[in-house]
C-alpha cells in the first residue's frame, strides 16, 4: 500500500474509531462470545440425566431425578459431550466462508452478521423444544462465532500501534479464557436460581447491544487486500 493509499484509508475511517476503541470493542465481543462456551459447560446448566450418575449406588440411581438440560431432554453424558463440541462444525464451515466473503463484503459488517447469528443461536437454545433443535442452534452459534474468529485478528494487525501488534493480540485472546470462566460462574448462578434456559437467554441479551453497535455504526474497512492467510492465523 502506497503512502497516498494509506492517507486515503485513514480519511475513510469513521468518527467513532480509534485503535484503542476497536481493541476494547473486540475484547468485549470476545468475552461475550466465550461466555456462551462457559454457560454450556456449567454444571448447573448441564444438570444430571434421569437415573443419576455412575458415582451413585444402585438404589440412589434408581430414585434419582434428572435436572437441568440433561434432565429436561433425557440426555446422557455422552450426548451432552456432543452438544458441547458440535459448535466446531459451524466454526470450521463458517471461518473460510467469512474469510472469502471479506473480499467483497465489508469485514466489520460480516462481524456484525456473525454476532447476530450468535444472539439468535443463544435465543434458540433458550427456547429449544428438543435436543436436536438445540444441536442445530449450537452449530449456528459456531457459524456466527467464525466471523469474529476469522476477521478480528486482521483488524488488530491493521490498527495496532507499531511494535504493539503481538501485545494487542494477546489482550484479545486473553479474553477467551476469561469469557469461559465468567460463563461458568454466570451459568452456575443463573442456572441454579432461574434455570438453564434463562442462562442462554441472558447471554443472547448480552450480545444484542454489541450486535446493534456493529450493525448500525459506520463500518471500518480492512487495510489488507488479501485476508485469507490472516484469517487462518486468526482462527487458531
Residues covered by each model-derived region:
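Cytoplasmic helix-loop-helix junction between adjacent transmembrane helices
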Residues: 137-176
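Residue-level signature of mid-helix packing/kink "hotspots" within the transmembrane helices
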Residues: 38, 88-96, 146, 180-181
Amino acid at each position: 500500500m502506497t503512502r497516498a493509499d494509506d492517507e486515503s484509508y485513514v480519511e475513510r475511517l469513521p468518527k467513532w474509531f480509534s485503535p484503542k476503541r476497536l481493541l476494547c470493542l473486540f475484547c468485549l465481543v470476545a468475552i461475550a462470545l466465550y461466555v456462551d462456551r462457559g454457560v454450556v459447560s456449567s454444571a448447573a446448566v448441564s444438570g444430571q440425566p434421569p437415573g443419576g450418575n455412575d458415582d451413585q449406588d444402585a438404589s440412589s440411581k434408581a430414585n434419582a431425578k434428572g435436572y437441568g438440560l440433561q434432565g429436561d431432554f433425557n440426555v446422557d453424558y455422552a450426548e451432552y459431550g456432543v452438544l458441547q463440541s458440535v459448535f466446531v462444525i459451524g466454526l470450521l464451515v463458517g471461518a473460510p466462508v467469512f474469510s472469502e466473503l471479506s473480499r467483497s463484503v465489508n469485514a466489520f459488517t460480516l462481524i456484525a452478521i456473525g454476532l447476530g447469528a450468535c444472539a439468535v443461536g443463544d435465543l434458540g437454545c433458550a427456547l429449544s423444544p428438543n435436543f436436536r433443535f438445540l444441536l442445530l442452534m449450537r452449530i449456528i452459534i459456531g457459524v456466527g462465532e467464525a466471523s469474529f474468529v476469522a476477521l478480528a485478528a486482521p483488524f488488530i494487525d491493521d490498527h495496532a500501534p507499531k511494535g504493539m501488534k503481538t501485545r494487542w493480540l494477546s489482550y484479545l485472546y486473553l479474553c477467551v479464557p476469561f469469557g469461559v470462566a465468567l460463563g461458568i460462574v454466570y451459568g452456575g448462578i443463573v442456572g441454579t436460581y432461574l434455570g438453564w434456559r434463562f442462562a442462554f437467554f441472558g447471554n443472547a441479551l448480552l450480545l444484542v447491544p454489541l450486535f446493534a453497535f456493529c450493525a448500525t455504526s459506520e463500518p471500518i474497512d480492512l487495510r489488507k487486500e488479501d485476508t485469507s492467510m490472516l484469517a487462518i492465523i486468526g482462527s487458531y
